[in-house]
Swiss-Prot record:
It comes from Arabidopsis thaliana. Keywords: Hypersensitive response, Immunity, Innate immunity, Plant defense. It holds the Pfam family MACPF. Signal peptide: none annotated. Negatively controls the salicylic acid (SA)-mediated pathway of programmed cell death in plant immunity. It comes from the Eukaryota. This is MACPF domain-containing protein At1g14780.
């Protein structure tokens, strides 16, 4: 047995009973014990009173091993999956590790090359997945009867008894989400295929090409000549065109690393990867010989930490936090902010606040925008809408009234201020409108010709001078301003009636902005309606195409609301074609999941009135970290 093999086995034995973050790839180096200085500390109590010698087939005897740890001899297998959809393949991977459900694990994402971090995004883009693997399991280590395990007192005492995002995030970072109860050691040679929605290759052909490639890789046949023969056969027999992604032997097409290669062509991606053994081996048969000398952990089995916390105060809150973390996978450094924003959200005004009964005289109660000579007027609700002091996480236009001809602006916000950010939101509010911005008249754009009403498209953002006047000699990074209210106004500028936007800003102390992103709706292919709209577009917003809110019929919706895409609108309403009613919201599914609104602008896209919303991430200044 090589020294490397002995080290891996010793690490594998010590990993049993440790914590693990299921969002990570299944590697021994990612095991968690809660304390980096104590490398052999476990999260669960194992019987150490009757330690014994553990015989591992092919590797000899290991001393002083808990009697709760057993070892079984492994085997060499060839596994071929069917061509499955995203959720079924994810569920299969979870079953291999004794994990319930279909939420993708880090191992699943690493195997198929998913890097977006968004379950909904990946599932929406993928048509099908397949796998062909040659697996050499040298032995299996496992804890006897894992369902009777008990967490150590230090882990039980670390469970927060209340909803404290900082403490909950610290627990997950230190201990992970699951406890390792089994480790399989050996090597695996895997080829996987990922088919995107853009590919029209049917499942039977995809399966045929996958299995054919697996045979060539794992049987030791002459790979290059066989591949050329198959391509010639397809051409000569008028078969469907051979998918170039499966030509993994062409160095010009394939990107290769140590134990990993990837080839992506025409919506099909083929990934070949080895774990364990010598990655420099030229063939599969040569690689097999090296597995006993260089083994690695190829699969883990787990039990959820929360299943061992049934009698611990706060276990339900921790379970909820872990469920959110596994579902949306925010970065660990943002986890406490993500949990801070994970509470319920509401719209202002709520539907109960909208007027019912006999409507007032529109002409006298509300100003109107004239769109054309013969068409209907678009009345404007100029009542200010506020979220009190709750951070705003989204906006939309809404058509009120019996005839749906009264334009209003609605705000989505967190439903309470009992958050880390909420504790620092002050009572200092400042209103700022597009009419207050210098040279705002340069951004007047007509709704439907110069003779009709106009829209002021200048972006409304906080004034940097506010920080200088309110910081009280502190660092300017100690103060941020967020949107907590909005109002539409119609003002006369000479003979023009112009629609303006006002925003209410609220001061947040001890916080600073770390990232900004402008988001707009899916109207058209261009968001610029004129030269002034182009001039007012933020240069720091990045690629506008990537920040569009897409309405894809294949999108995986994780929102359980009755109308997650917004309330229904009468299909035949004549006003709808002039107003974009998209909901511009960012929630937990938009990594890292704690966006809030800091700016808005009105703009026109092909004659349609739209919103363009600036979202930002806030971090707390001088965040205290307890020991």
């Amino acid at each position: 047995m090589s020294r490397d093999g002995g080290d891996v086995i010793e690490t594998a034995v010590k990993s049993l009973g440790k914590g693990f973050d299921l969002t990570a790839d299944f590697r021994l180096k990612y095991c968690k014990d809660g304390d980096g200085s104590a490398g052999d500390d476990r999260l669960v109590v194992l019987d150490q009173t009757q330690n014994r010698e553990l015989h591992i087939p092919g590797f000899g005897v290991f001393q002083n091993v808990s009697a709760d740890i057993n070892c079984d001899k492994g085997e060499r297998t060839r596994f071929r999956s069917d061509i499955l959809d995203f959720n079924k393949m994810s569920e299969y991977f979870n079953q291999r590790s004794s994990v319930t459900g279909k939420i993708p694990s880090g191992n699943f994402n690493a195997t198929f090359g998913f890097q977006s971090g968004s379950w909904a995004t990946d599932a929406a883009n993928v048509k099908s997945l397949g796998l062909d693997a040659s697996v050499v399991t040298l032995f299996n280590l496992h804890i006897h009867n894992p369902n009777r395990l008990r967490l150590t007192d230090r882990v039980r005492n670390a469970v927060p008894s209340s909803w404290d995002p900082q403490l909950l995030a610290r627990f997950i970072e230190r201990y992970g989400t699951h406890v390792i109860t089994g480790v399989s050691v050996g090597g695996q040679d895997v080829v996987v295929v990922r088919q995107d929605k853009s590919s029209d290759l049917d499942n039977d052909l995809l399966r045929h090409h996958l299995y054919d490639l697996g045979d060539q890789l794992f049987t030791g046949s002459c790979l290059l000549s066989t591949r050329r023969l198959n391509k010639a056969y397809h051409h000569s027999h008028s078969q469907p065109k051979f998918p170039e992604a499966f030509n993994v032997f062409d160095d010009k097409q394939t990107v290769a690393f140590n134990n990993f290669s990837i080839n992506s062509q025409n919506g099909i991606t083929v990934i070949c990867a080895k774990r364990g053994g010598d990655g420099r081996a030229k063939s599969h048969s040569e690689w097999l010989i090296t597995v006993p000398d260089k083994p690695d952990a190829i699969n883990f089995n787990f039990i959820p930490i929360t299943s061992l916390l049934k009698d611990v105060p706060g276990s339900g809150l921790l379970s909820h936090a872990m469920s959110l973390y596994l579902r949306y996978k925010p970065p660990l450094m943002d986890l406490q902010y993500f949990l801070d924003f994970s509470g319920p959200r509401a719209w202002a005004p709520v539907h109960n606040d909208l007027p019912f009964g006999a409507a007032p005289n529109m002409a006298s109660a509300y100003p109107a925008l004239h769109i054309n000579f013969m068409g209907p007027k678009l009345y404007v609700n100029t009542t200010p809408v506020t979220s009190e002091k709750n951070p705003v996480t989204g906006m939309r236009f809404f058509l009120e009234g019996k005839k749906c001809n009264r334009l209003a602006i609605h705000l989505q916000h967190l439903d309470n201020t009992r958050t880390t950010v909420g504790e620092k939101i002050t009572d200092e509010h400042i209103w700022r409108g597009s009419d207050q911005i210098t040279d705002n008249d340069r951004y007047f754009e007509p709704l439907n010709g110069k003779k009709f009403s106009h829209v002021c498209t200048v972006p409304v953002k906080y004034d940097p001078n506010w920080i200088k006047t309110t910081s009280n000699h502190k660092s300017q990074n100690d103060v941020a301003f967020i949107v907590t209210g909005a109002q539409l106004e119609v003002k006369k500028h000479g003979s023009k009636s112009v629609l303006h936007l006002r925003l209410r800003y609220t001061k947040v102390s001890d916080h600073y902005v770390v990232q900004n992103s402008w988001v707009h709706g899916p109207i058209g292919t261009s968001q610029k309606s004129g030269i002034f709209s182009s001039m007012s577009m933020p240069l720091t917003s990045g690629s506008v195409h990537h920040n569009m809110i897409q309405k894809d019929k294949n999108e995986v919706v994780l929102d359980s609301g009755v109308f997650p895409g917004g309330p229904p609108v009468p299909a035949n309403n004549k006003i709808v074609k002039f107003v974009d009613l998209s909901q511009l919201c960012r929630g937990p599914q938009h990594s890292p999941g704690h966006w809030l609104v800091t700016g808005v602008r009105l703009y026109l896209d092909k004659g349609k009135l739209c919103l363009h919303v600036k979202f930002a991430l806030l971090h707390r200044q001088r965040l205290l970290v307890s020991s």
